[in-house]
Amino acid sequence: KGGAGGGGGEEEQGSSQNRIFFNALLSSLDVSMNDDYSAFFALYTIYAIFENKGDADELLTAARLPHASKRPQADPCTRLEAEKDCDPRLLEALRLLVGAAGRANCRLRTITLQLACLVLRQFVLALDANDVHDQIRALAESTKKCLTGRLSEAAFVHHKDLFIDMFDEEYVEFESFRLRLDVVGHELLLPPSSSPMSGLPLNKRIPSGREETTRATLASYLHVRKLERDMADACDDELPVRVGDNPLVAVDDCINLANSDLLSCTVIVSPSNERQSRFLVADQLQLILVEPAGKAGWGAVRFAGLLQDTSISGEPSDSRVLHIVVEGPPRPSGVSWRVGAARRTPLLQAKLIFDDHIRCMAGKQRLTKGRAGARELKHSALCSVLRLRPPGDGVRGGGSSSHFDRLHRVNPFRVVTGCAPGSVRKQNSPSVLDGREEDAPPEDPVVKRH
């Protein structure tokens, strides 16, 4: 420490020289020149201190880390001042680390960014200071803006066809992954790898190639977006992305097909080879297989899947046959994404046999066109939520006005939810009052003409 005749600057300099561990911690948090190997363990140490349930008030006070005291003090003012004392250099180092996620050349892994966001939340809860709260919120907004600019190029130029699938998969990983200090993994003890052949999860290594870089940017965007919403004390009601406000058709619903184009076909489901007689229907978003109900013009839904997740192919040896695969929503992989990993389980693998090749061609054209339209709608809705716009476009938004007009999806069917199997729907009113059978679908609404 400085001598008796020295000023406050000498005392501060002497104190800084004696805090060897703290200075090493600050140096480790710098990711401007190197990778985040040291930064991860520095954040890991700080987060472990916050999560420690023991009595470490004196240690935290000496380290100038904000904390909630676990012991009563005689002087509440002194206790409050000690709890909320925070070295500004540490807070600035954390802010610079999170801000580095917006740079294109930064070697910051997703797991390190997630840990930094957790530590910043702990600081905000302990400090309870409006200025710190506003600084972190502004930091999250500026970082999210930088990430949005990088995602715009991927969404409209490099990966337009795959951007929907990549976002859905990374969003599932973001929602399911929970960081646990006791099972971090031995792979983090080694320097960060950038090779997909290492077998490491993408969030624990540096991305390689354009596709992995886009996925890592999406994951970083989701973490920074959550930090921003937490600082604003707001819920994220825009994710997951929805197209339109109307609910989707579900299995066992009863729908009015009076104004729909139906294609009769025989469905052979793989791998059981079960044969079913169905009618093929498609709206803006869904592929639907129905069977006739008890009333003319109505059908009971036996399968419903998203057109955006449907693949269609013909059979060279038979012009009446279509092969379809409808994939389910992405599932958490447990080891995150890597090349060749199966992220989706098919909901339906089937062969559709039509009466003739003309109906088969009509069905293929309808499904192919419907899939392209459904993916375009989902792409426009996703870009609207993420505030993405084409590179060089000064208009805010992710697509043309015609695309946004189509987001207000109108369900072409009159849907009765919850029909029992066999295309019947129980009515609340007695059948003797209206002369209808109790198990029949409801009557169509009567349009009054004046």
Located regions from the model:
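Alpha-solenoid helical-repeat scaffold
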Residues: 25-72, 76-253
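Surface-exposed beta-strand-to-loop junctions
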Residues: 18-22, 67, 88-93, 326-332
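Helix-boundary capping/turn motifs
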Residues: 14-21, 84-91, 257-258, 277-283
